[in-house]
A protein has these predicted regions:
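FNR/FR-type flavoprotein reductase catalytic core
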Residues: 1-112
């Protein structure tokens, strides 16, 4: 997720917390700077439900994906954020060998 595009993931996390449903989920959350990071309390609570959050100031690249999600080839990816970020992430994942059928996208334009 990029920037405020993390909002749909906060909703998913709240659902898991409320239903006490465990999920093997890894959230890669990038932001331009630390002051833009939102929903930290929600994601902290989601760790009780099996979520792991990896915060990144700056751009998520292939090495970061490999480091944080070693089993990336078997995962389903949900990408939400500004269109340029979503398209770049999708291309990057396809380049890593992730099936395009395992990549779900949501363009989140934010307030701009």
């Amino acid at each position: 997720a990029g920037g405020i595009g993390v909002t749909p993931f906060a909703s998913m996390a709240r659902h898991c917390i409320k239903s006490e449903e465990n999920r093997d989920a890894v959230l890669l959350y990038s932001s331009k700077n630390a002051s833009e990071v939102v929903y930290q309390d929600v994601f902290s609570s989601a760790s009780r439900c099996g979520w792991r959050i990896a915060y990144r100031i700056g751009v998520i690249d292939t090495e970061y994906i490999k480091q944080e999600v070693p089993d990336y080839a078997e995962r389903t990816f949900y990408i939400s954020g500004p269109p340029s970020m979503v398209n770049a992430m999708k291309s990057m994942l396809i380049g890593l060998g992730v099936s395009r059928f395992n990549i779900k996208t949501d363009f989140f334009h934010g307030l701009a």
